[in-house]
Every structure is written in structure tokens, then in C-alpha cells.
Amino acid sequence: MQCMICQSGMQYFFSKTFTQFDLDQVDYWKCSACGFAASKTHLDMSDERWARLNNDFHSQTHYTEDNPYNRNQRYFNQALMLSLMRKQDLIPAGDWLDWGCGVGAVARLLRDYFDLRLDTYDKYFTPEVNAVTASALKPCGHQLVLNTAVFEHVRDRATLNEIESYVKPDSGCLAVHTLVPENVPANPDWMYLLPVHCAFHTNRSMQLLMDQWGYRCSVYNEHAKLWVMFREAPAAIEPKVAALNKAMGWQYLHFKPGFMDYWK
């Protein structure tokens, strides 16, 4: 199997046995070059089985009040982070898009509490606010493309490239929420191995994606658990980050040229 990030070969890593959602043994493979790991079992599924797995999992976990995967505090912190970055002129005004938005929780918070519009698109859910159809998406047309809890569900490079393709090529920003460790652990009990998670990035694989897509620096906030990547030069972004951090009175945004590898 070939790595979707760097095209190097991947080798068998470890297996985990599930007892729900029509899953049994799941085999995870790892790229020796960039550390990216993926479930070969999930990547080999038919589109129909993959859609059924996602529907079954999210129908059981997404809407219940005691849902352990429902991150309402994170959604609010993401909306807050984006609004503060807009105020600091780190993210330009214009069309904003949440690709793979679920029901549109971040967009609703931005609308209700920060007077900002975030358009929403999802292949599997019906967003509650600002929904746009696939035909209305604007290639190279958005100043911000956000995706939260999406990268770990992506089974092919074409989908990653599609998400990024909606960012304006000069001044647009890409915001990504996923878990990015230094190394993916060879541990079947690792908490991120959910039945619908099939792709696991590392600091190295994310740096390669930034290089391939032309992003030059990034910031991270640990409460929002969100990265925002910029095509502008680090020298143009860093003073604005410093100004926001000074106003907040603490290191609200962590900045770095290249990928902000916060989780070592």
C-alpha cells in the first residue's frame, strides 16, 4: 500500500479487533518515511460499506446528550479562536467554508455569538445553518476553509486535495482539527482508534502536506485543538500573532514557520 502523503511504501503496523458496527479485525499500516498510518481495512472497503459504517456510528453517537465524542466546548473555542483571528486580521474577511461540518455547530456559534458567517457543507449530514450544495462550492474561492474531525476520516489523497482546493491561492487559510502526535503508537488501545477513524497523521506528514500545498507557517490553540495554516510569509503573520497574544496576556496562539508541532 502506498502512503497518500509522501507516496512511499507502507508496511503492516498492528491490528485491533472491534465488536461493533460490522467490524472485526482492522489492520493498520504505517509509512516508514513520514509516519502516517492508515487502516488498510477501511481503505479497502466499498464506498457503500464505508457510508453505512459512518451512518451507523454517527447515528448512535452524534446526537445523544451523553455522547462522549460530542465536543461542544471545543466547538465554542474554535468559534472564539476564529473570531479573534479575524479581529486581528490574521484571517481575511470574505467567504468562509466549513467542509465536512456535520450539523454545522461551529457555524451556528459564529453566527449567534460573533456575527460571522461560515458556510457549511457535508456529504453525510444536513447542516442546520448556512448550508451550501456541492455545486455551489467555489474552487480557489474561500478565504478560510475549515474542517474539524475530518482528516482522520479521509481514505484517499483526492479528498484531501479537494478540501484544500477551495482555499484562495494567495491569501486564503486552511484550518484543520485532528489529532497530530509526533508518532502514531502501535497500541490497539490508543484512544483515537474509533471505528470510523482510518487515517492518522504525524507532525512530519502534516509538514509535508503544508509543503505540497504551499503553506508557509501555522498557528495552534490547545483549547480549540485547531491549526490554521497560512500561505503568507512568516514575517507577515508572526507580528499579528504576537499582538493578539499580548492583548490576551498569555500565549493564546502558538506560532511556527512550517507546521506548529505542538504535540511532541
Give the predicted meaning of each segment:
Residues 1-144, 148, 157-161, 240-264:
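Conserved N-terminal segment of class I S-adenosyl-L-methionine
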Residues 110-111, 167, 210:
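A generic structural signal for well-ordered alpha-helical segments
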Residues 149, 153, 197:
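Histidine-centered divalent metal-coordination motifs
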Residues 149, 178, 221:
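Active-site proximal loops enriched in glycine and acidic residues that flank catalytic Cys/His/Asp
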Residues 153-166, 178:
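A short, conserved alpha-helix within the catalytic core of class I
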Residues 167-174:
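Short glycine-dipeptide loop
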Residues 176-199, 204-211:
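Short, glycine-/aromatic-enriched active-site segment of Class I SAM-dependent methyltransferases
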